[in-house]
Amino acid sequence: MQKLKQQVFDANMDLPRYGLVTFTWGNVSAIDRERGLVVIKPSGVAYETMKVDDMVVVDMDGKVVEGGYRPSSDTATHLALYQRYPSLGGVVHTHSTHATAWAQAGMAIPALGTTHADYFFGDIPCTRALSEEEVQGEYELNTGKVIIETLGEVEPLHTPGIVVYQHGPFAWGKDAHDAVHNAVVMEEVAKMAWIARGINPALNPIDDYLMNKHFMRKHGPNAYYGQK
């Protein structure tokens, strides 16, 4: 597990590096599918003092199996996503400014241009509000459930992120590094959408044919973007 702990530590340290977190407002995890174990950031530990061995290992029920700290308070959300989507290898949650602003506004981040379409096949959805019962009950688990409910039958790696109503963004990927990459892109396209809508409030979404081209040339079966 040491290799995975290093990867998760590095991914967590990328959050302040890319300006996605203030104080301790974020967490990254990754899963070892063969062992059924998840490595995640400890709860409330400052990035400035955090070390590789501070990462916490939990089983799929959230029980700590390795580590001297409590795991992130969002652990149950991460576990719900891993259990539902076998293609996920890493999950990240932040309160990055622009993506969180869309969450607080209760609005999906609209697909307005090719930067968005290179990573997200359509709008980045916003969940419904959690009920009082859901919040007072198993809040973090119910956050995972409302993400799953909102995604429906969507392939999660085609829409590798979401904003939770009045809360903030979650992103995911094939591993922890990929999840952080998608979180960085989500914050950038959230900012771009806010600026673009300010310039032209009547702006239309990106044309489907242009969105399809940009997404499929990177992620489709005949993708040709980048090097082999």
Curated annotation (Swiss-Prot):
Induction: Induced by L-ascorbate. Repressed by UlaR. It comes from Salmonella paratyphi C (strain RKS4594). GO terms for molecular function: aldehyde-lyase activity; L-ribulose-phosphate 4-epimerase activity; zinc ion binding. It catalyses: L-ribulose 5-phosphate = D-xylulose 5-phosphate. Keywords: Carbohydrate metabolism, Isomerase, Metal-binding, Zinc. This is L-ribulose-5-phosphate 4-epimerase UlaF. InterPro entries: Aldolase_class_II_sugar_metab, Aldolase_II/adducin_N, Aldolase_II/adducin_N_sf, UlaF. NCBIfam families: PRK08193.1, PRK12348.1. Substrate binds at residues 26-27, 43-44, 72-73. The lineage of its organism: Bacteria, Pseudomonadati, Pseudomonadota, Gammaproteobacteria, Enterobacterales.
